[in-house]
């Protein structure tokens, strides 16, 4: 029999529709709260190879589909499956287990999502190529607006059901539902895409509302959830139902709700799925090695350190340069000297995001750009680098620091208190000879800044810098400063955002989010020129021209002074670990803005490392001895020779 190949999937579907007579084999499902669905839901859907079923690979290239059959695992073939790893998740238990909706701007929630769910495809920034995940094949329609994905027929949810095109549709409907309370999500998805179309059981098409070179990546890298749960609820009931629950996922791990608890500051437990559908894929060799991943929560620095050296958990990220250089040394800790605890710094290309002091530009006093500009000359970063940071960090001066997207002529934010005072005087802030504080209209210049316990060591420098020119800064210690920031109930905030290898300025800098809460545009940037440039950036298919556009955006945004830029580490991770682990030669991944196997930052260990039985036994023996020492492993990993570049 001869088939006529046509690039249009619709042509194929209209002529090659084969009735599926069903399967009498019954599946046993785990107990989840589902809606009733017919066991013959897909009985009229064609599962032939031509329409995405098993054997599709034979015809895919003829039909214009793409895939990547040359994915090399970043894991080690020597990795050993089994055992448990325990990390500190955050300072406090997250307010939800959802990663869609309000209160979800959390790196830890992104980790939870990546353990349990999968994206359609994954982008590997090291190779600059897409890699299959839920979708084995993909293609872009001739109109450059329609994107097609073929779900791998082998893909299964953790309860045994098939992953299908219907799941992609249901996930889209959730994302655009305003009831979940996250305007960044529902606005962007509704503005960018029409509702996906189920072409066949395994093939889904998604049409964009405008030509945008970034649309494919936005769709491809989105996580997919099961339709037989989502079809029962809307955005509002999703918030209620899944506040502290997770739907079945297709990923390598599943949350263990029997062990997960909010008691004793909280514990979140994930178990490795022995029935993970892609467990034997060559691209997953050496990955997802731990049977159990525990996340504990500790909100006290001293307790966190004490519990690590007591062996209560396995990986400790050292956040303070002073501690790395003076405290966690062989001279101070016998465990380090004897090799029971290892030091490690990994260099990679994990992208650096914007960070520093940011302002609520909707509120006094930072609704005045001259005041914001003055603050850019008050903060003495050089003193911090020298006195506190041991020159471990590098100052930033861009929304996209150290990348080709950084504008070379961004305004210099140097320490110049005389210039700062001049700008404040011009803005109406004056200080009488007998006064300590600047004042305007009878009101002294006094502001509050929320901070975490222990951060006063850094921010006291700022308190003194501000006091020297007549500004009173009160540090208010709370548990969760980020919540105040994202809700826009702050005056000034120190923090930052995860970097992106490829910029997406829309959510952080477009004015359509300026008046919303729970958005990345927490400083309320609203600049019409930036808006126009963002729109030009999204529709420009020339990479070199896009770089120039982002540089223009960077130049304009930095001159709005919403951020007084801070510092960042030139490496991916610095910390301590119990000496019982094996790891790939690269240590961690290359780097990405999304938490998955290519992440390259904090907690990447749980996907690439493994428990070495021999090392574990030696560690046990050494802990029972006062004199036994273990080999000291390499303290620095620079697999990609970043230091020489």
Q: Where do the language-model regions lie?
A:
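Alpha-helical secondary-structure segments
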Residues: 86, 164-171, 201-205, 252, ...
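Detector for C-terminal structural segments
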Residues: 32-34, 68-69, 259, 265-267, ...
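Surface-exposed binding/hinge segments that line
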Residues: 78-80, 185-235, 241-243, 252-254, ...
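Gly/Pro-rich hinge or "lid" segments in bacterial periplasmic/extracellular proteins
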Residues: 111-118, 122-129, 221-287, 291-292, ...
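Aromatic-rich, solvent-exposed beta-strand/loop patch
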Residues: 158, 207-229, 247-303, 327-352, ...
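Extracellular/periplasmic solute-recognition and catalytic clefts
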Residues: 25, 178, 182, 196, ...
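N-terminal lobe/hinge region of extracytoplasmic solute-binding protein
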Residues: 52-73, 83-142, 173, 248-250, ...
């Amino acid at each position: 029999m001869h088939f006529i190949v046509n690039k249009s999937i619709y042509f194929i579907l209209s002529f090659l529709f084969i009735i599926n007579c069903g399967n009498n084999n019954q599946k046993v499902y785990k107990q989840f709260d589902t809606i009733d669905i017919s066991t013959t839901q897909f009985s009229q859907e064609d599962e032939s190879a031509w329409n995405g079923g098993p054997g599709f690979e034979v015809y895919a290239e003829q039909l214009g589909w793409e895939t990547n059959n040359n994915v090399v695992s970043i894991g080690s073939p020597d990795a050993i499956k089994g055992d448990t790893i325990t990390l500190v998740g955050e300072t406090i238990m997250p307010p939800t287990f959802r990663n869609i909706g309000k209160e979800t701007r959390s790196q830890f929630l992104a980790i939870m999502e990546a353990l349990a769910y999968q994206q359609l495809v994954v982008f590997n920034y090291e190779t600059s190529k897409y890699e299959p995940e839920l979708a084995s094949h993909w293609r872009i329609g001739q109109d450059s607006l329609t994107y097609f994905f073929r779900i791998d027929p082998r893909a299964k949810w953790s309860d045994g059901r098939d992953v299908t095109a219907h799941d992609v549709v249901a996930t889209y409907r959730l994302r655009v539902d305003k009831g979940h309370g996250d305007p960044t999500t529902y606005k962007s998805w509704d503005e960018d895409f029409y509702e996906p179309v189920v072409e066949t059981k395994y093939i889904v098409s998604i049409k964009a509302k405008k030509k945008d070179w970034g649309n494919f990546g936005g769709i491809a890298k989105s996580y997919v959830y099961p339709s037989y749960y989502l079809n029962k609820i809307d955005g509002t009931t999703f918030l209620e139902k899944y506040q502290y629950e997770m739907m079945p996922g297709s990923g390598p791990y599943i949350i263990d709700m029997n062990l997960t608890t909010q008691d004793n500051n909280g514990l979140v437990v994930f178990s490795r799925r022995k029935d993970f559908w892609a467990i034997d894929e060559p691209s997953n060799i050496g990955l997802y090695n731990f049977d159990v991943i525990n996340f504990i929560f500790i909100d006290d620095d001293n307790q966190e350190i004490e519990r690590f050296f007591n062996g209560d958990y396995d990986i400790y990220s050292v956040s303070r340069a002073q501690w790395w250089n003076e405290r966690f040394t062989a001279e101070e800790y016998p465990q380090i000297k004897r090799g029971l605890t290892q030091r490690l710094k990994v260099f990679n290309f994990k992208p650096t995001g914007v960070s520093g002091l940011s302002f609520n530009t909707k509120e006094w006093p930072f609704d005045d750009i001259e005041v914001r500009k003055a603050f850019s000359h008050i903060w003495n970063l050089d003193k911090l680098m020298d006195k506190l940071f041991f020159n471990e960090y590098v100052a930033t001066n861009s929304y996209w620091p150290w990348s080709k997207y950084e504008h070379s002529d961004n305004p210099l934010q140097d320490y110049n208190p005389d210039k700062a005072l001049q700008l404040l005087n011009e803005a109406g802030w004056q200080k009488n000879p007998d006064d300590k504080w600047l004042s305007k209209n009878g009101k002294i210049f006094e502001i509050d800044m929320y901070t975490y316990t222990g951060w006063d060591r850094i921010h006291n420098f700022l308190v003194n810098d501000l006091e020297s020119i007549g500004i009173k800064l009160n540090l208010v210690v709370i548990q969760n400063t980020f919540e105040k920031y994202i809700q826009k109930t702050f005056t000034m905030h120190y923090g930052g955002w995860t970097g992106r290898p490829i910029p997406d300025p829309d959510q952080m800098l477009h004015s359509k989010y300026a008046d919303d809460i729970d958005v990345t545009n927490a400083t309320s940037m609203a600049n019409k020129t930036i808006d126009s440039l963002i729109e030009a950036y999204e529709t420009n298919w020339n990479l070199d021209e896009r770089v120039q556009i982002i540089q223009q955006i960077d130049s304009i945004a930095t001159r709005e002074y919403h951020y007084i830029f801070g510092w960042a580490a030139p490496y991916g991770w610095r910390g301590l670990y119990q000496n019982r682990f094996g790891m790939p030669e690269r240590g961690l991944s290359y780097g990405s803005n999304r938490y998955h196997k290519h992440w390259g930052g904090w907690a990447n260990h749980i996907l690439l490392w493994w428990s070495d039985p021999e090392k574990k036994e030696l560690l046990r023996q050494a802990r029972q001895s006062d004199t036994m020492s273990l080999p000291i492993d390499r303290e620095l990993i620079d697999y990609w020779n970043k230091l020489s570049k």
